[in-house]
């Protein structure tokens, strides 16, 4: 890496913070072989009117590109750039048009990069159309139109939802249909995308306060909340229609119910009560019911064992995820168990990890899988439970009366709990696909040609 990229990386590392007006700038860098670019990815400030709470006021970028030659290398360049930047790139509460233009001109002549100001009051979606239509091609079309709407659906989460429905359909003891499977896949995907788009459209002012969510399209201004709702209505209606006409009315009702449950009930409850986590777990258990109902009646207890697995899995997965970003949830105003009651958060993770054992046993007992499934699923459940127990036990020590009196010991114990939470989260990420894949491998009757004795056992047990 050349000297000048190191200089700008040094500026980024020192955050370029200016205290006047209590405004702080977060800087990110993009380093290329021929061009260096520094961007203000967001502006946060401390508001006295909000009790010192951190607020996020702008996510529109300010770009800096170099106007120097690489031959200009002096020993004092690093200090000169930093001191000049600190003097000229100041943010204050009172900004006038004249002073802003003078500062821009002054910065362009003294700093080794050009400054491109972006009006923070004008979101990208409200800027003149000619500003975005210049040089329009497939690349910009993908970036400006396709990708924002695709991101509204939370693709990775939607894929997981769709796969859970497919796995449940595959485990059904009744015959499968290719057309039915195709309609189930497309309809479930569209319903999940619709629910996620509603969720994003309702929470931009809160999402921009969290690092994990501040790059979402509605927060960036690529899509307005109204556009997000219109998109959600379109794909939601299409998804429910496909499920109704291509599968059956029961699956369509479940799909529509899940859109309402996630997009409205769960999203509304996130800022009111910790019960939102249980509502979110209910959302997770509906897709396996949809997959099962596509081929089999929901009266079969095996369907509820599968749904129970997805319900229970949500807690060790989400509770450990939220533990390590609990302060972000708190600052954004989300009422989560991770910061409201940290010990309960860990205890619930362990409780539902243990619940996986009888649920997997139920799959074999009700003839969905063979009995060999208990061996490998038991090992995977034990792995998840082990880390959930470590996380819970450390939190129990941390929040004991003795530890709470010793800040040094508490902070040290909290660092250990953070590690166990990450371990439990990673175990949960691998746990669910492993459990479902093994269930398909051990589906009842799949290996009867190797173990003919299995075929003679009773096939129905209710």
Swiss-Prot record:
- Physiological role: Catalyzes the first reaction in the biosynthesis of heme A, a prosthetic group of mitochondrial cytochrome c oxidase (CcO). Heme A is synthesized from heme B by two sequential enzymatic reactions catalyzed by heme O synthase (HOS/COX10) and heme A synthase (HAS/COX15). HOS converts heme B (protoheme IX) to heme O by substitution of the vinyl group on carbon 2 of heme B porphyrin ring with a hydroxyethyl farnesyl side group.
Q: Is the Transcription regulation keyword given for this protein?
A: no
* PROSITE patterns per UniProt: UBIA
- Give the pathway: Porphyrin-containing compound metabolism; heme O biosynthesis; heme O from protoheme: step 1/1
Give the PANTHER family listed for this entry.
Answer: PROTOHEME IX FARNESYLTRANSFERASE, MITOCHONDRIAL (PTHR43448:SF2)
Organism superkingdom: Eukaryota
Q: Please name the Pfam families in this protein's record.
A: UbiA
Activity regulation information from UniProt: Positively regulated by the hydroxylated intermediate (heme I) formed at the subsequent step, or by HAS/COX15 itself.
Phenotype upon changing residue 317 to A: Abolishes catalytic activity. Has no catalytic activity and does not form high-molecular-weight complexes
Signal sequence span is none
Q: Does the keyword Transmembrane helix apply?
A: yes
Chief location bin:
mitochondrion
- Per the record, the gene is COX10
A Gene Ontology biological process noted in the UniProt record is: heme O biosynthetic process
Induction note: Not regulated by intracellular heme levels.
Q: What is this protein called?
A: Protoheme IX farnesyltransferase, mitochondrial
Indicate the impact reported for residue 196 to K.
Gain-of-function and specific suppressor of coa2 deletion cells. Does not attenuate catalytic activity. Forms more abundant high-molecular-weight complexes. Has no catalytic activity and does not form high-molecular-weight complexes
Gene3D superfamilies, A to Z: UbiA prenyltransferase
- Membrane spanning stretches: 158-178, 234-254, 274-294, 298-318, 352-372, 373-393, 425-445
* Transit peptide, residues from-to: 1-30
Keywords, A to Z?
Heme biosynthesis, Membrane, Mitochondrion, Transferase, Transit peptide, Transmembrane, Transmembrane helix
Q: Mutating residue 212 to A leads to what result? A: Loss of function. Restored function
Q: Where in the cell is it found?
A: Mitochondrion; Mitochondrion membrane
Family annotation (CDD domains): PT_UbiA_Cox10
């Amino acid at each position: 890496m050349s000297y000048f990229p190191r200089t700008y990386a040094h500026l980024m590392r020192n955050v370029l913070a200016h205290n006047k007006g209590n405004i702080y700038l977060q800087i990110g860098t993009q380093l290329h072989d021929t061009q260096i670019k520094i961007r203000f990815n967001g502006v946060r400030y401390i508001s006295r009117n909000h009790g010192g709470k951190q607020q996020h006021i702008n996510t529109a970028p300010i770009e800096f590109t170099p106007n120097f030659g690489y031959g200009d290398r002096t020993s004092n360049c690093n200090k000169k750039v930093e001191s000049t930047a600190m003097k000229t790139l100041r943010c204050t509460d009172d900004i006038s048009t004249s002073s802003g233009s003078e500062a821009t001109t002054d910065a362009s002549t003294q700093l080794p990069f050009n400054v491109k100001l972006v009006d923070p009051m004008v979101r990208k979606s409200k800027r003149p159309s000619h500003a975005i239509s210049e040089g329009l091609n497939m690349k910009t079309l993908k970036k400006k139109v396709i990708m924002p709407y695709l991101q509204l659906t939370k693709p990775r989460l939607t894929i997981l939802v769709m796969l859970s429905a497919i796995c449940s359909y595959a485990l059904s003891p009744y015959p499968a249909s290719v057309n039915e499977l195709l309609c189930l896949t497309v309809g479930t995907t569209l319903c999940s995308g619709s629910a996620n788009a509603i969720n994003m459209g309702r929470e931009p002012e809160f999402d921009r306060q969290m690092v994990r969510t501040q790059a979402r399209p509605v927060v960036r201004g690529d899509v307005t909340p109204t556009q997000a709702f219109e998109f959600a209505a379109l794909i939601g209606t299409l998804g429910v229609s496909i499920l109704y006409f291509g599968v059956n009315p029961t699956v369509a009702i479940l799909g529509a119910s899940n859109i309402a449950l996630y997009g409205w009930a769960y999203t509304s409850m996130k800022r009111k009560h910790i019960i939102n986590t249980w509502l979110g777990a209910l959302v997770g258990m509906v897709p396996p019911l949809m997959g099962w109902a596509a081929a089999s009646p929901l009266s079969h207890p095996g369907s509820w064992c599968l749904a129970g697995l997805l319900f229970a899995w949500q807690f060790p997965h989400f509770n450990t995820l939220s533990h390590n970003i609990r302060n972000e949830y708190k600052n954004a105003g989300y009422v989560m168990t991770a910061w409201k009651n940290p010990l309960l958060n860990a205890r619930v993770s362990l409780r539902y990890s243990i619940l996986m054992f009888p649920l997997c046993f139920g799959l074999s007992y009700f003839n969905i899988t063979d009995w060999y499934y208990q061996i490998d699923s038991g090992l995977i459940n034990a792995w998840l439970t082990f880390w959930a127990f470590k996380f819970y036990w450390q939190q129990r020590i941390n929040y004991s009366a003795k530890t709470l009196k010793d800040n040094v010991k508490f902070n040290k114990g909290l660092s250990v709990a953070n590690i166990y939470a990450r371990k439990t989260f990673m175990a949960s990420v691998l746990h669910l696909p492993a459990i479902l894949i093994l269930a398909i491998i051990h589906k009842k009757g799949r290996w009867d040609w190797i173990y003919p004795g299995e075929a003679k056992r009773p096939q129905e047990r209710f």
